[in-house]
């Protein structure tokens, strides 16, 4: 329970007090819980996250000032309307997810102590993949089993998969806020004008590839297992169709665990995370399985390309 005096009280389901009152520097305005994690956002934009089970916090209190464009607004000589917080949520790992009225969506990194932007209106008007999912990928994937061979029905109950749906939620908020503010029509006209201009022939393609890369990175950041798998295959299909040899080679090397490894480089004792990790699974998926599916997609694109050449 949150009170006007800036205190937060926690009780058990039976009504017993679990901990002493938690005193904040301002009145709580947004609260959310996910599992044992409790999120509290107060009136001055400070975000607190507590683990009620371990009576600890994954990171110090963090301010919403960076995502509210405080730095940009302070440099202007006149008063401007700043974005408002539409919702604040927690994922299964206790990570803060925030959606704003300007269409931006952010997540706070507990490891790097920084806000990361996961969604923005720019992708909505320039990407061919906005509000879409490649059904040809999702329907032909050979398996949806994880490392332990269980079905997706069982995976939905596991904590690592509770982040599923966060990226579509943020993108839907981006679409809604862009339409409400009337920006979508103006930006779409601007992009259409650029597409027919000389020198911008590959503009839409570049934005679409960048949007898929943003989706893959966001899914990895949030630990969204099923979405990472889908977006990765969509990305592999797109860069294969674009003929981006350097990106294809780097993607294959990263799936094998040696994306930035040089022949003359000495072994580093410090272990990397994400794409920098040399071994282990990627967001709950075995690297060998992901590599096999990516190679299968690239092989189909290559065979289709060779058939077209023979027909010509």
Protein language model regions, located:
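Long, contiguous hydrophobic alpha-helical segments, chiefly transmembrane helices and signal peptides
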Residues: 1, 8-11, 40, 50, ...
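WD40-like beta-propeller blades
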Residues: 1-86, 108-129, 308-312
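Short amphipathic alpha-helical molecular recognition features
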Residues: 19-23, 30, 39, 80, ...
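Sequence-level detector for tyrosine residue identity
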Residues: 48, 106-108, 113, 129, ...
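Acidic, small-residue rich beta-repeat scaffolds with periodic aromatic anchors
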Residues: 92-95, 100-142, 146, 154-165
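C-terminal scaffolding/assembly regions of large eukaryotic complex subunits
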Residues: 133-312
């Amino acid at each position: 329970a949150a009170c006007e005096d800036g205190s937060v009280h926690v009780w058990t389901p039976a009504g017993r007090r679990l901990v002493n009152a938690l005193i904040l520097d301002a009145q709580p305005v947004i609260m959310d819980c996910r599992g044992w994690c409790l999120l509290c956002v107060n009136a001055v934009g400070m975000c607190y996250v507590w683990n009620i089970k371990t009576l600890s916090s994954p990171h110090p209190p963090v301010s919403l000032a960076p995502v509210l464009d405080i730095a940009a607004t302070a440099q202007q000589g006149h008063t401007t309307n700043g974005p408002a917080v539409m919702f604040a949520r927690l994922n299964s790992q206790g990570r803060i997810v925030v959606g704003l009225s300007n269409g931006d969506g952010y997540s706070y990194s507990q490891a790097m102590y920084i806000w990361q932007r996961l969604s923005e209106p720019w992708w909505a008007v320039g990407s061919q993949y906005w509000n879409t999912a490649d059904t040809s990928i999702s329907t032909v994937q050979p398996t949806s089993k994880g490392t332990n061979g269980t079905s997706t029905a069982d995976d939905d109950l596991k904590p690592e998969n509770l982040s599923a749906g966060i990226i579509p939620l943020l993108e839907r908020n981006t679409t809604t806020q862009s339409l409400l503010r009337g920006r979508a029509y103006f930006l779409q006209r601007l992009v259409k004008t650029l597409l027919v201009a000389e020198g911008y022939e590959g503009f839409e393609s570049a934005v679409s590839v960048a949007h898929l890369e943003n989706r893959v990175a966001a899914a990895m950041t949030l630990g969204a297992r099923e979405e990472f798998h889908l977006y990765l295959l969509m990305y592999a299909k797109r860069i294969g169709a674009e003929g981006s040899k350097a990106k294809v080679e780097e993607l294959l090397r990263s799936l094998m665990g040696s994306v930035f490894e040089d022949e003359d480089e000495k072994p580093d004792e410090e272990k990397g995370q994400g794409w920098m990790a040399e071994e282990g699974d990627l967001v709950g998926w075995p690297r060998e399985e992901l590599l096999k599916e990516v190679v299968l997609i690239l092989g189909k694109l290559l065979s289709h390309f060779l058939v077209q050449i023979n027909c010509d």
